[in-house]
Design a protein with these regions (language model features):
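AMP-dependent adenylate-forming
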Residues: 14-39, 596-598
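Conserved pre-ATP/AMP-binding loop-to-beta segment of ANL
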Residues: 26, 140, 158-159, 163-196, ...
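Conserved AMP-binding/adenylate-forming core of the ANL superfamily
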Residues: 27-81, 98-103, 160-162, 211-212
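Conserved AMP-binding A3 loop
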Residues: 38-42, 192-218
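Structural core segment of the AMP-binding/adenylate-forming
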Residues: 57-58, 81, 85-167
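Conserved AMP-binding/adenylation subdomain of ANL enzymes
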Residues: 215-236, 240-346, 356
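Conserved ATP-binding/catalytic segment of the ANL
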Residues: 435-500
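Conserved C-terminal "lid"/linker of ANL adenylate-forming enzymes
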Residues: 498, 523-526, 570-635
Length: 635
């Protein structure tokens, strides 16, 4: 079903029922007790109408902001569909945000109602509700909330989603005509969502995304990847509060009639994959890195013949992939060897993903080239995309039949990407889908964009909007990149750039990705701005350390945040030196300290999209960082 630029979010599912699937077909799958249970289009749309009816009875009007602080689940979809068809605005809040940030977002957006996912989050909302004057209803998605609600004596009404739906059903017949009329009156230019960017610095900013932003992005992504059909099953586990999962999974499924299954948690993702057998998944690179690390560890730890077979299979897969990607036909011998590798090794790894994956969509951060190549060797396609919350999000994505590892793919249709010289502000090149040339390469600069996927602006922040979108309509991403073999290639964020004391520019992300090839390193944070050389805070792999040194869990519960024992430092340093040879001398780590446990969202060190907050970490560990440099000078 071809989308037009007149499409709106509430039209998508109804068009699927009209043109693709009968309303009794399965739209969503949810784990209930031990099995995944189907939820039909009819159930979804009926619940949306009941929720809309309740909203109308309680004075909700077009343009009102409605909140979510809930994990991925069918209830999210019911609530969202219910508000979208009235022209209301989805404000999804990361469950991991601090009380202060949640309170700020509720008040900045002037939320009226909020759907809550867990008892812990309900407790948080009850605590901050007295400070949120526009909030009228807190809606737990669970029924056993009364005991907790008794601790609250304010004016905000607390009732479960089931109670809300039942109440709305009583007046649905009366409200039905109004709901249908309001749905038809939603315009593409109307605001659909405020997505508050976590950012690595500063106060959260509400990115204003319209129905046109979302639906246009879905349309052109399906043009770029026409292999997504109405028969797909997506497994959703990245947060729907993030624009990547919202567009690449939820909205794609709404538009294309694909099924969407919800994972129970990241910890149970592997189990859920075996149960759901997804054909498509949207992931972040960190998950792929973990799968790669585990597969390599399992494949090489057995020793003897098994390890030889595993390494031979990976090498064979690499040879086969390189031939295919060069546009040639593999020899009969290589094809036979590839089939043997598939039977002995690759099929067993694929089984752990459910066995039916056509491809994986990777986004949210740059995918290290070696990780893309590893999955390519197995015969699992990784389609890497690039974008930001402000671009709805996709700007470029890998084509199904053209893999250039280390790039984020071809410019999507109907947008223009420019590369701007950071110093002179001269636009070096402008590229579109139609100007694509597989041999084209450009100089490096800031990535800028024009198109229907660019946000309307930042909520209540006209100055920030004017900074981000210039007078010629270019949105400035703050990312550094270039074109390579016709595809867009990302270097790093401009604000991440380190300038050493010799004036040399150092982009930390590609350097960090080089060291993250090591199975001894779990996380790494580069330091070196205005310093003579590069140093790092390294979080060693807990699992591999425990195995190598026979450590107990108590070792990682020590109050000292850092590990000082030389045997552990030397163990990590072996791999630091090993991977340093891949880098220029000024990019190499000269010294490092070992952090006992990972950087986390809960400690305020990472964003919800798992990016380290550089300024926060530098400030938090300033003493340890300074000591590391002083030690170097003393030596």
């Amino acid at each position: 079903m071809k989308l037009t630029d007149q499409a709106t979010i509430p039209q998508l599912l109804r068009n699927v029922v009209k043109y693709i699937h009968p309303e009794t077909d399965t739209f969503m799958l949810e784990k209930v007790k031990d099995t995944y249970q189907p939820i039909s289009y009819k159930t979804t749309l009926d619940n949306a109408d009941r929720i809309s009816s309740f909203f109308l009875d309680n004075g909700i009007q077009k343009g009102d902001r409605m909140g979510f602080i809930v994990e991925n689940c069918p209830e999210y979809v019911f609530f969202d569909q219910g508000l979208q068809q009235l022209g209301c605005v989805n404000v999804s809040i990361y469950p991991t945000l601090s009380d202060d940030d949640v309170e700020y977002i509720i008040n900045d957006s002037q939320l009226k109602m909020i759907l809550v996912g867990t008892h812990f989050l309900l407790k948080k909302l009850i605590k901050i509700a007295p400070n949120c004057p526009t909030l009228t209803h807190i809606v737990p998605k669970f029924d056993d909330y009364q005991k907790m609600a008794q601790t609250y004596s304010g004016d905000v009404c607390i009732l479960s989603l089931n109670e809300l739906i039942a109440t709305g059903e009583k007046t649905l017949e009366h409200n039905s005509a109004t709901i249908n009329k309001m749905r038809d009156e939603v315009k593409p230019s109307d605001l659909s969502s405020l997505i508050y960017t976590s950012g690595t610095t500063g106060t959260p900013k509400g990115v204003m995304l319209s129905h046109l932003n979302f639906c246009h992005n879905v349309k052109v992504c399906l043009m770029q990847i026409p292999h997504i059909t109405s028969e797909e099953t997506f497994l959703s586990f990245l947060p729907l509060s993030h624009v990547f999962e919202r567009t690449a999974t939820y909205h794609i499924c709404c538009a294309q009639g694909s099924k969407i299954a919800f994972a129970q948690s990241l910890e149970l993702l592997g189990k859920n994959m075996m149960e759901v057998h997804p054909t498509v998944m949207s992931v972040v690179p960190r998950l792929l890195e973990k799968i790669n690390e585990k597969a390599m560890k399992n494949g090489t730890s057995a020793g003897g013949l098994k390890t030889k077979i595993f390494l031979w299979s990976i090498a064979t897969g690499s040879k086969y992939r390189n031939v295919i990607e060069s546009g040639k036909t593999p020899s009969m011998l290589l094809s036979m060897q590839r089939n043997i590798a598939e039977k002995l090794v690759f099929s067993k790894i694929k089984e752990k993903t459910g066995g039916n994956l056509k491809f994986i969509i990777s986004g949210g951060a740059a995918l290290p080239q070696n990780i893309g190549e590893f999955f390519g060797n197995l015969g699992i396609k990784i389609l890497e995309g690039y974008g930001l919350t402000e671009t709805s999000p996709v700007m470029a994505v890998t084509e199904f039949d053209r893999q250039i590892y280390g790039t984020v793919g071809r410019v999507i249709p109907e947008v223009t990407i420019g590369i701007q010289d950071a110093d002179t502000k001269r636009i070096i090149t402008e590229q579109t889908y139609d100007t694509f040339d597989e041999n084209f390469e450009s100089a490096e600069g800031e990535i800028i964009l024009r198109g229907n996927n660019v946000m309307q602006g930042y909520w209540n922040k006209p100055e920030d909007t004017a900074q981000a979108i210039d007078t010629d309509g270019w949105f400035h991403t703050g990312d550094v990149g270039k074109f390579y073999k016709g595809n867009l290639k990302i270097t790093d964020r401009i604000k991440n750039m380190l300038v050493n004391s010799f004036g040399k520019n150092v982009y930390p992300t590609p350097i960090e990705n080089t060291y993250l090839q090591s199975n001894r390193i779990d996380q790494i944070f580069l330091i070196g701005d205005k310093r003579e050389h590069i140093t790092a805070i390294i979080v060693p792999s807990k699992e591999n350390m425990m195995e190598e040194f026979g450590l107990k869990e108590s070792f990682f519960q020590d109050n000292d945040l850092f590990i000082h024992d030389e045997q552990f430092t030397e163990w990590v340093d072996e791999h630091v030196r090993k991977y340093s040879v891949e880098l220029a001398k000024f990019e190499r780590i000269k010294n490092f300290i070992l952090k006992r446990n990972p950087f986390t969202i809960e400690d305020g060190e990472m964003t919800p999209t798992l990016k380290i907050k550089r300024r926060i970490v530098e400030k938090k560990f300033a003493v340890e960082i300074d000591e590391m440099y002083l030690l170097e000078e003393a030596e």
